Amino acid sequence: MSDLMTEQKRYYAERAPEYDDWWYRRGRYALEPRALERWHADAAEAEDALEAFPPGRSVLELAAGTGIWTRKLVRLADRVVAVDANAETLALNTSDAELVQADVFEWESGERFDLVFFSFWLSHVPDVRFDEFWAHVRAALAPDDRVFLVDSGAGETGHTGTDQAGGEETRSLSDGRTFRIVKRRWLPDELAERVRRLGFELDLHDSANGHFLYGGGALA
């Protein structure tokens, strides 16, 4: 599993210059107009849910990547600490956040935040490290603080990738190179039950057109 996680980390480092093409549906991720309208509607649904949550004054964003959601968070919170393992992705993130290059499984802030946020990360956490990751989330929260996540919907196929057995996926870059990554698409009820056993109570939803899973909650 460590080899797979190393390959996944390298994939996202190499993908950094083209990562945003997926979110903005450019190039090989382009959609025909009606499909693009559905994509934008789902993105707006998730964004509106985050804004209505709302984040609070201080936010810890884990696996922040190139900053697609960081830029939304800095408009909603007074302070955002954005952590990612790759310098290549953080170089494209926003200077309005406090950027930290670190492995999210190892980094400890020693602080408590009003909100812990992560987008399109949980589906890349291997099952053997799932509980460990949520322990890190818990450590960054005071009892009344909260968590919010956005991820791929269970039926989402918007990436250029091939599903493999055992929660893996083969992804390709625009230059043709391929990488293996972890990828598990969760159903809302399935994920809510899994984290409930770890002491979190989350209200999770699929977006109207099925592209995203999103929602939040707090320690139970």
Where are these regions (language model features)?
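Conserved class I S-adenosyl-L-methionine
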Residues: M1-P54
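Class I SAM-dependent methyltransferase SAM/SAH-binding core
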Residues: L60-W107
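A conserved beta-strand element that flanks and buttresses the S-adenosyl-L-methionine
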Residues: F117
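Short catalytic micro-motifs in class I SAM-dependent methyltransferases
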Residues: F120-H124
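A short glycine-rich, Lys/Arg-flanked "PGG" loop and its adjoining helix->strand segment in the class I
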Residues: D131-P143
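C-terminal alpha-helical "lid/dimerization" subdomain adjacent to the S-adenosyl-L-methionine
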Residues: V150-R197, H205
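Conserved S-adenosyl-L-methionine
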Residues: F200-F212
